[in-house]
């Protein structure tokens, strides 16, 4: 499955990295330093057990027009930048792309719905935690369940996302 990420900070890195175990992962990040680090050395994650893992997505770019449509797009960008990031990433979101928000805060769904049809939107919560240690480097600080659902779409979208997450090692 082709999975895109909107933002590759602390949490985006945890999810993007782990999902490379089972999927093609593509990253859009507005920060060139993040893209350069991920493309050069991969995503480095310091795990809670003390181990360090490195994952290699297909590409990290500041130009999403080079990527194409995704099966799933996972949003981790800060709310303040959400609208402009979604506008830039329209080429990654096709008529069958499921857009999942795992962002903190409220109001994300409404912002996403300005750009994406509501039937394509999933929202979720996660008990995972992370700290950003630098471009492409995160410390995984907490592990737990990730819950996904839809507001207007059918449960099939949420099931597809949950399957993709499980394949990457998330519960």
Where in the sequence are the language-model features?
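Nucleotide donor/acceptor-binding cores
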Residues: 1, 71, 144
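Short, charged/polar "capping" segments at the starts of alpha-helices
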Residues: 34-37, 109-110, 156
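NAD(P)+-binding Rossmann beta1-loop-alpha1 motif at the extreme N-terminus of oxidoreductases
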Residues: 1-48
């Amino acid at each position: 499955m082709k999975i895109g990420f909107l933002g590759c900070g602390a949490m985006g890195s945890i999810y993007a990295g782990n999902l490379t175990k089972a999927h093609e992962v593509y990253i859009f990040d507005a920060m060139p330093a993040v893209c350069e680090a991920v493309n050069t050395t991969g995503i480095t994650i310091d795990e809670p057990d003390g181990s360090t893992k490195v994952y290699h997505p297909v590409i990290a770019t500041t130009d999403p027009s080079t990527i194409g449509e995704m099966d799933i797009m996972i949003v981790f960008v800060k709310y303040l930048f959400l609208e402009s990031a979604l506008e830039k990433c329209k080429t990654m979101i096709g008529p069958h792309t499921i857009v999942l928000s795992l962002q903190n805060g409220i109001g994300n769904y409404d912002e996403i719905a300005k750009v994406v049809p509501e039937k394509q939107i999933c929202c979720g919560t996660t008990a995972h935690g992370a700290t950003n240690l630098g471009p492409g480097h995160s410390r995984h600080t907490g592990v737990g369940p990730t819950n996904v659902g839809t507001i207007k779409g059918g449960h099939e979208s949420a099931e597809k996302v949950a399957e993709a997450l499980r394949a990457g090692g998330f519960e």
